[in-house]
Design a protein with these regions (language model features):
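C-terminal substrate-binding subdomain of Rossmann-fold SDR/epimerase-dehydratase oxidoreductases
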Residues: 56-195
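Charged/polar positions on well-ordered alpha helices
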Residues: 12-13, 17, 21, 25, ...
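Proline-glycine-enriched beta-turn/loop adjacent to the NAD(P) cofactor-binding site
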Residues: 36
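Rossmann-like NAD(P)H-binding beta-loop-alpha module
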Residues: 40
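Catalytic helix-loop patch of NAD(P)-dependent Rossmann-fold dehydrogenases
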Residues: 1-32, 43-44
Length: 195
């Protein structure tokens, strides 16, 4: 995103630009990886899947922004790991076709690249919640709220470049991923069934 609309995105982009400068100055092969809505076991407890699962199990309401109209490219953690491993085995190289007098924004004189790692199949937030409900066999109490400032309505990862470079293919659809997470969550927190 060359025109970020929030500080979080701006910090990510500035990190990529600093990494490019470092790669250029010291000719260190560098790959920036952009992860798209990572979820799964051992994830961050402040993320939606954790918060929604915990609140549904405790009978508390969940806050759903943009009145549930978000689309997210949910990517299961195993698919992220696959992308990292494959990418690490194929470092970027200097592009001899780069022209300093007529620079193409998609190329670099440094051994540098940015790759998206995602599922490339956006799912509605409401579908995601339905899958959580189904796997818990409980209904969520939903509090619909307007979209938050700086939030985007849809995320979608174009994974064509990582597919062509390292044969990355996401293998986990959201139905399987949410099911795996719920099973892990219940075992980890010693709950065999919802309260």
């Amino acid at each position: 995103a060359n025109h970020p609309i929030q500080f979080y995105a701006a910090t990510k982009r500035s990190n990529e630009l600093m990494a490019h400068s470092y790669s250029h100055m010291f000719q260190i092969p560098t790959t920036g990886l952009r992860f798209f809505t990572v979820y799964g076991p051992w994830g961050r407890p402040d993320m939606a899947l954790f918060k929604f699962t915990k609140n549904i199990l405790e009978g508390k309401s969940i806050e759903v922004f943009n009145h549930g109209n978000h689309l997210r490219d949910f990517t299961y953690v195993d698919d992220i790991v696959q992308g990292i491993v494959k990418t690490s085995r194929n470092p970027p190289k200097y592009d001899p076709s780069f022209d300093h007098f007529d620079p193409d924004q998609g190329k670099s004189s440094a051994p540098f690249r940015i790759l998206n790692i995602g599922n490339s199949n956006p799912v509605t937030l409401m579908r995601y919640i339905e899958l959580i409900e189904h796997n818990l066999n409980l209904k969520a109490k939903i509090q619909f709220l307007p979209i938050q400032d700086g939030d985007v309505e849809k995320t979608y990862s174009d994974i064509s470049r990582i597919q062509s470079l390292v044969s990355y293919t996401p293998n986990t659809d959201v139905e399987v991923g949410v099911k795996n997470f719920i099973k892990w969550y219940l075992q980890y927190y010693h709950q065999t069934e919802p309260k």
